[in-house]
């Protein structure tokens, strides 16, 4: 009887693993193609508490975040956090999702933890800015956070955000200077065109800027964004996951 019971559970586990593999492969395919709602529908069918792979859990959390299901995304990412304690990537995302679910105090806790783990990581300033924004802190403090980030990293999204903050604060000359810097450094792309439109609220574009702006639709229609290889990412070498995410070794699907 004991042998029969063991064989039965082995068969059940084999079916579970097959269904899990089949569903997650399809889910990641849909995620890769941008069909997040359909990917989320598959994710709803899986008991993620039994999954130990922190990378897979992070992907699922991102799917829910893309569909606006922030609480689900937060809950799944909390599981990833438990599987990979000390991961700055997961802690950073948890901070952002905590804000999206209205939990500012939790976001501050994750920010403090991020600072302990990675005190020199410039992304601390982005987290700080998001928290200050959620708290409706004085605009000067928000500007200071993004100015500090700019000293270490210059990313289109946050450069444009800084330009908008300058506009909000009535700092028109700083706003225009930031727009010109963004346009000069990155030349094209959605944030460059947004910066051009922001600048045009106050003064005309230069001839070269205007030429780029006039050709923006033709250029963007020709561009094809490279899609990340989610499958390779999800099947990352275990040792690399241990190093970067402090993931747990062993089978991805936990025993029931």
Provide a role label for each language-model segment.
Residues 32, 66-72, 100-109, 134-142, ...:
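Alpha-helical linker/edge segments of TPR/alpha-solenoid repeat scaffolds
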Residues 210-256:
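Intrinsically disordered, low-complexity acidic segments enriched in Asp/Glu and Pro
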Residues 12-16, 44-51, 78-86, 112-120, ...:
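Solenoid-like repeat scaffolds
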Residues 141-206:
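Compact, basic/aliphatic-enriched, mixed alpha/beta core segments that act as assembly/interaction modules
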Residues 21, 54-55, 89, 123, ...:
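Start-of-helix register in tetratricopeptide repeats
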Residues 25, 59, 93, 127, ...:
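"A position-specific structural signal for the A-helix of alpha-solenoid helical repeats
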Residues 21-48, 56-66:
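Alpha-helical segment of the N-proximal tetratricopeptide repeat
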């Amino acid at each position: 009887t004991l042998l029969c019971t063991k064989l039965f559970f082995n068969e059940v586990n084999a079916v579970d693993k097959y269904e899990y593999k089949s569903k997650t492969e399809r889910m990641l395919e849909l995620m890769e193609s941008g069909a997040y709602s359909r990917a989320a529908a598959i994710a709803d069918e899986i008991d993620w508490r039994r999954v130990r792979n922190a990378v897979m859990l992070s992907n699922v959390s991102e799917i829910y975040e893309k569909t606006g299901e922030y609480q689900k995304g937060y809950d799944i990412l909390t599981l990833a956090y438990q599987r990979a304690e000390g991961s700055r990537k997961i802690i950073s995302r948890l901070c952002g999702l905590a804000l999206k679910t209205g939990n500012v105090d939790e976001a501050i806790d994750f920010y403090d933890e991020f600072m302990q783990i990675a005190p020199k990581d410039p992304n601390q300033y982005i987290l700080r800015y998001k928290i200050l924004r959620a708290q409706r802190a004085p605009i000067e403090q928000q500007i200071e956070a993004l100015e500090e980030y700019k000293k270490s990293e210059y990313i289109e999204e946050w450069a444009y955000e800084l330009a908008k903050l300058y506009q909000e604060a009535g700092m028109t000359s700083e706003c225009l200077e930031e727009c010109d810097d963004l346009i000069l450094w990155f030349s094209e792309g959605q944030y460059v065109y947004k910066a051009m439109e922001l600048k045009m609220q106050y003064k005309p574009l230069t001839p070269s800027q205007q030429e780029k702006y006039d050709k923006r639709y033709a250029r963007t229609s020709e561009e094809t964004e490279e899609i990340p290889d989610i499958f390779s990412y999800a099947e990352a070498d275990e040792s690399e996951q241990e190093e970067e995410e402090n993931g747990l070794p062993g089978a991805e699907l936990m025993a029931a």
